[in-house]
Amino acid sequence: RPVARGAAIPRYRAGAPPADFVHGGEGFGDLPAKQPAGKPDNRDAAQFLCESCAAHPGEVIICAVGPLTNLAAALDHDPSITQTVKRVVLMGGSAARHGNVSDCAEANIWNDPDAADAVFGADWHVTMIGLDVTEKTQCTPEDFATLAESAPVIGGFLEQASRFYFDFHEAKTGKRSCFMHDPSAIIAVTDPGLFRYERDPVTVV
């Protein structure tokens, strides 16, 4: 499956340092990141997204689980992506709840608010899975142990990587469980009927 290189920095401001105290130095807890066997697509992420949606109009669902820099760049590259994409599902924001990097800001939006405002302001179907949703979906070490047992290679890797994340949450909340932020957005793509939705305008300030 093709992988395209994304933007290195936010749209109009300096990038924040990675949250290695939450996810570890490479994003996998204490585990090292493995070098990929293949090479990235020759196109950057913005071009790749636009061309993929144009090639399959009305079929592609984009699920964004990080800052929205690449989606905003795709809007700049080809504004017609709003007509060719089926919908956008993103993990980010916080509706009627606190933030996780400040009193009101969620990390993915906070890391590139200009891009987020462009994405929310575009004329396409956006589903926001915010902290008000993801902090209700929690997993325990036992859940990951079951995953490792049922899928030893991938599940075993996730079980090992999750230990760092459990340590972070336990130090913060006193409970050995963790919020399932990004997986909640993915589940909203694969099984949208598990969620209840509200239609509201969103602006990033």
Pin down the residues of each PLM region:
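N-terminal acidic, glycine/proline-rich low-complexity segments
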Residues: 1-205
